[in-house]
């Protein structure tokens, strides 16, 4: 598929997603799922496949009025966030939704070790097939955790493998807003972080004094097979690190279309962020973004009243973007950046907007057929310190909103992609979000927003469950 054809297919996919038009294809599979892929949800204890299927069948057979959840990949994590998601599934979801179509994978560090990371490879394959994924926060083990958990090695973050496996183009991180509750930004802020390339896929070696030569051998074209020198330098330090990485630009066209399409839908002003004055190799990122905007979106932004006639797409240096995120508290803008800059800037975005718990995180990839693969998760980690307090018997108060927004996004996307019980799924997820927002407005939320009088983790879960029944 050529880049132009790919762009057209992606544009159609984005239009379908924005308009919420569902695919007519119903998901089916005859794939046999290994027993170790499925885990128990309460307390993190593993169960075999037959036990899990018995539970699924029981969910679907006892209440015909239950919503039928569309096929979705559910990735289990660990520590405090896994505990809270266990509660949410048992108290909010499973009494009302038949989740028999979900494929659940145990991505805890111990299971990755036990399966030699086969579970991660199976998650990626399932994600390609099903196209809708929810992932709980997971642990990337430190050296101390490797010893404590009895692991054979320090397994790397699964995120990079997922981004590559699903042909990731962007990680979307947006502000979450609750009417009547003051957070950071008054209006929505959208952020697109290039999902691949940069330091995250780097190779490195610790070295001493010597000569460093970086070479490249083209695999096609007139110079195929001929090695060329990219860089050559003397290292004079006794201790140094040599790092190599590359930035792929083929999928920046897809990133641009997705970013500008979302900004247009939300009616917010787009900005492109680089450090191209210093890092000259970042220039193509800006040029591609500007070309796609000028040729495909500029007139639409003017027609929608988001930009004025003659107004150009604005480039921001990453230094300036850092300041603008603090200054533009009114919100109403979008930014797109390289992988590393996007990582740093979205951390700042989260702090301005109260905490990472009020930021969404959505990996968007493109299937080989041109349709979108979407993986949803919280933008924060496993909250290990709070889990340690819970295990000591202390009260905790974890705000689950970021994780719930991820679950809502995954369930809605699954229903849209597979066209299964779509209307009831959207109605249920909307009610779930509405109830959470109501409780926060009434001062009955978790303590990060409601102070010492706020509810504990378990009290908040129960409060939402009661209103879902109302």
Curated annotation (Swiss-Prot):
Subunit structure comment from the entry: Forms homodimers.
Gene name per UniProt: IDH
Protein's UniProt name: Isocitrate dehydrogenase (NAD(+)), mitochondrial
Function per UniProt: Performs an essential role in the oxidative function of the tricarboxylic acid cycle and respiration. Catalyzes the decarboxylation of isocitrate to produce 2-oxoglutarate and generate NADH to provide electrons for energy production.
Enzyme class: oxidoreductase
Source organism of the structure: Ostreococcus tauri
Details of cofactor binding: Binds 1 Mg(2+) or Mn(2+) ion per subunit.
Activity regulation statement: The homodimer exhibits allosteric regulation by isocitrate.
Cofactor dependency: Mg(2+); Mn(2+)
């Amino acid at each position: 598929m050529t880049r132009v054809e790919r762009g057209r297919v992606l544009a159609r996919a984005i239009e379908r997603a924005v308009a919420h038009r569902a695919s007519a294809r119903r998901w089916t599979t005859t794939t046999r799922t290994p027993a170790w892929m499925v885990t128990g949800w309460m307390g993190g204890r593993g169960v075999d496949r037959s036990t899990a299927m018995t539970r699924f069948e029981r969910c679907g057979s006892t209440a015909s009025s239950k919503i039928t959840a569309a096929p979705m990949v559910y990735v289990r994590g660990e520590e405090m966030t896994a505990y809270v998601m266990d509660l949410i599934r048992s108290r909010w979801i499973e009494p009302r939704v038949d989740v028999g179509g979900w494929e659940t994978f145990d991505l805890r560090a111990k299971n990755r070790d036990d399966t030699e990371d086969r579970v991660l490879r199976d998650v990626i394959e399932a994600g390609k097939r099903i196209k809708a994924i929810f992932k709980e926060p997971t642990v990337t083990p430190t050296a101390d955790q490797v010893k404590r958990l009895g692991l054979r090695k320090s397994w790397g973050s699964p995120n990079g493998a997922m981004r590559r496996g699903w042909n990731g183009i962007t990680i979307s991180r947006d502000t979450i807003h609750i009417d009547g509750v003051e957070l950071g930004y008054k209006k929505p802020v959208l952020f697109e972080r290039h999902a691949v390339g940069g330091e995250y896929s780097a190779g490195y070696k610790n070295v001493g004094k010597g000569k460093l030569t970086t070479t490249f051998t083209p695999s096609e074209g007139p110079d195929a097979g001929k090695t060329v020198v990219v860089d050559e330098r003397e290292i004079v330090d006794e201790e140094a690190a040599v790092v190599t990485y590359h930035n792929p630009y083929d999928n920046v066209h897809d990133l641009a279309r997705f970013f500008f399409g979302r900004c247009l839908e939300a009616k917010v002003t787009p900005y492109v962020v680089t450090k191209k004055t210093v890092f000259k190799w970042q220039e193509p990122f800006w040029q591609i973004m500007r070309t796609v905007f000028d040729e495909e979106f500029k007139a639409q932004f003017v027609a929608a009243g988001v930009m004025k006639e003659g107004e150009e797409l604005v480039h921001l240096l990453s230094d300036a973007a850092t300041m603008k995120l603090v200054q533009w508290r009114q919100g109403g803008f979008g930014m797109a950046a390289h992988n590393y800059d996007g990582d740093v800037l979205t951390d700042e975005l989260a702090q301005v907007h109260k905490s990472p718990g009020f930021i969404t995180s959505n990996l968007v990839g493109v299937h080989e057929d041109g349709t979108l693969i979407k993986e949803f998760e919280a933008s924060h980690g496993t909250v290990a310190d709070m889990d340690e307090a819970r295990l000591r018997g202390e009260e905790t108060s974890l705000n689950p909103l970021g994780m719930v927004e991820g679950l809502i996004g995954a369930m809605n996307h699954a229903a849209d992609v597979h066209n299964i019980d779509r209307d009831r799924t959207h109605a249920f997820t909307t009610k779930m979000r509405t109830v959470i927002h109501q409780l926060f407005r009434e001062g009955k939320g978790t303590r990060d927003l409601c102070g010492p009088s706020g509810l504990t983790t378990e009290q908040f879960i129960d409060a939402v469950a009661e209103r879902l029944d109302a």
